[in-house]
């Protein structure tokens, strides 16, 4: 449950950063489409993470393994570091 929440909150945080960086769109999906592939090294991974976040948020019976959840959190972590040009300590 905590990992599901971490994924949903991580996705929201990245969406807020994208808005602040001026990426247009009504939602995160539209903002992701506005990103040039050279802007984020792991853009495809971010897309996949966002799709899984949507399934977590909208499909009550969607199951995600702990390993997959940790992988997605790692993708969000790396994306935030890239977007903000900072190094974060993952706890």
For the regions a language model picked out, list residue spans one by one:
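Histidine-centered, metal-coordinating catalytic motifs and their short helical/loop contexts
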Residues: 39-63
